[in-house]
C-alpha cells in the first residue's frame, strides 16, 4: 500500500521521497515496453478487466485486444499521482481528489471502499511469519492478512514431494500445487 511504502520510508529511508519516487514517476510518464507475460496476463484476465471502464480504456484497444507486445504503455495519470505523493505524502493519496476517485471507482464497480475508508487507512507493523522450505528461510506477512499463512502452508505441504522429478509446469507438478493450495485455503 502507499501508506506502507511511506511508513517504511519515514522509519527507515535515507533518500528524500521525491528522489526515491523519481524513477517510478518517469517510468509511468515515459512508458515501458509491453512484455509477452504482461500481454498474456491481460488476455487471461480479459473478462474481468473489461468489466471496468478504466481498465478497459487503459489496457485494451478498440477491438478489445490487450495492448500489443513490444508496444509502449504510458500511464500519465499514474505519473501525476506518484508526483503528488512525492510532494505531499500520504494525504495526497488518502484524502482529496485521488481518494475520491478511488472510492467512486470502487463503489461504481460494486466495491465497498468509501472516502471514509481511504481517509482512515493506516499502515501497521505486524510480526512476520516464517518457515523453512528446502533449506531456505521464507518470511512473509503475518495476520491480519491471510496470504502469508496460506503461502507457508502450501510450501510446507509441497516440501513432501519431489518436484524436480515431476518437472517444471508438468501436469503432476500443477496437480500437486493445486492440491496443496486447496488444503492450505481450507
State each model region's role.
Residues 1-186:
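Feature marks proteins synthesized as precursors that undergo proteolytic processing into two chains
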